[in-house]
Amino acid sequence: MVFRQHPNTSGLCFVTFDFDVVIIGAGAAGLMCAIEAGKRGRRVLVLDHAKKLAEKIRISGGGRCNFTNLHTDAEMFLSQNRHFCKSALKQYSQHDFINLLSSHKIAFHEKKLGQLFCDGSSQDIITMLQTECAAAHVSIRLEQHIDDISRHGNGGAIRNDNCHNRGFVVQGNFSPIHAESVVIATGGLSIPKIGASGFGYKIAEKFGLSLVDTRPGLVPLTFDADMLTRCKGLSGLSVEARVFCQRAGFAEGLLFTHRGLSGPSILQISSYWDAGLPITVDLVPGTDMAAFLKASKRQTPKQDVRTCLGTYLPNRLAADICEQAGMASSLTAHNDNSLHQMGTAVNSWQLVPAGTEGYRTAEVTIGGVDTAGLSSTTMQAQNVPGLLFIGEVVDGTGHVGG
């Protein structure tokens, strides 16, 4: 047992604790929090319902863990309060984490756009976190199913109900655990097959914190029957594209799938898309396709339109575009206005998604615990001393790419 004294205007209150800190969730946020708390001499316990810790780290980056981004800043996060993200990022930057990896001699490389991946596998990151936890004397218990978290009541542990921080009781398939502080690092709703749940939101509401509506983010987009038939015929093709929605735009890979559209550019824009809104896709960014088609007509008039489009696009996609436009013959068979319309369509393909693939494949959850109720420097609930929320459970969602 650990004993803490909390003086206040009414005198002293004595609270008996099993641990200084109990962290719910053995993912990236929970383990990093445990390490830092342990380094400060706190007695830390991490609880998770999974059989293995850090499952989301394990599957991230195609198994190589895209662990951070060299260009990370607050502008790469979606939140109702951008200033919160800016302040939070100042507490621990991407460079701090890179230095941690270097101290463990973990080899990594930049793939593109500042995205850093392990040369080996995601297990390198997990092993590093386990090693750091052990060095900080952090206790980790897996397959722990938590039923409830509550404030201490008027039992023997509490001598004064006016105590500023009365501590918490964590209850589940184990003997009740008493802790001075509890950190909720349970993540969001994305990828339920690895154990995602809304437990963190339930606890936030119980203690009076507001929630920002949640929805899937970084998720493939789906389409109606006609567009879906086209996507199925093009399944497996990828192009470098620019995709826009509202004021957001991303220039990265786009992938046709048997369910719709995916790839980094689509995952990015999905976080900015709302039901009913169109997205605009530039299939050949940086090239004026209308001008190119008209110039090609003058230079090689007998060339068919499909071959001309194939200069920049995969043959199957070029053929599909020609079929949709009814322009499968030679360039000379079409007037400049028709070629201009086709070129414009290639640079500004307008689509209205029917929806997304949902939390099943979403990489993140947008929304969550409203940051208005949290301190941006400590992540502690402003009206509940000792209760903290970190990671994906909070309303602060990053771009794809670390």
Describe each PLM feature range:
Residues 51-53, 58-59, 67-74, 107, ...:
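An anion/pyrophosphate-binding glycine-rich loop and adjacent beta-alpha core
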Residues 142, 319-397:
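A glycine-rich dinucleotide-binding beta-alpha-beta segment and adjacent secondary-structure elements
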